[in-house]
Amino acid sequence: MARLKTLQKLIKNNQSLLLFILLMSCFRSAIADWYIVPTGSMKPTIIEGDQITVNKIAYDLKLPFTSISLLKTGAPAHGDIIVFESVAADTRLIKRVIGLPGDVVSMSNHVITINGTTLNQRLLNETANEYLFLETLDKSKHITRLKKHVNSNLSSFPKVTVPDGHYLVLGDNRLNSADSRVYGFVPHHELKGKATHVAFSRDYDNFYLPRSERWFKSLYQ
């Protein structure tokens, strides 16, 4: 009984704090959240240590703490960067949308073709170890990274048709990304939201010091 009274008193004395925690949890679950990127699969757009803001109502309004969609608010577009809980990969992933439902997509020696149209790739920079390309996908322009001297089965795939309710996604770091080439199409119900900005960034290779030049940086050109 004494423990129960102590608990009741504790709750009563901290009602404002508990309400704030509940509201913040609901906000992060259903409206917006952030995600620390641990890998380089989206380089150079996103690098290790970036903390990304995610708009969780970009495509659906979901019941907090569930995957139940209450209202469809939009649909992913070509070039969107999405965060999703991949059942196939058994982890949360962040990738760029390349193929929409109904699209016919193929890749030949790193060059993507969608519905018979080959994407424009303009060489921006070349070093001893890599190429950087500016890739144009509808209204989206983004930089992709291609490492040299790497033999990989990720460089090409035959024509595939994206099923209804699914998306084909790739990482911008094309030869260092486990994406639809590995795990297949992404079903819509796995989507958590659209990544929009770098909120904060720390340099893993320099004592985790802040990289202020990346703070509040948009992920889109």
Each predicted region: which residue ranges?
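Soluble "head" domains of membrane/secretory-pathway proteins
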Residues: 2-11, 26, 30-36, 41-221
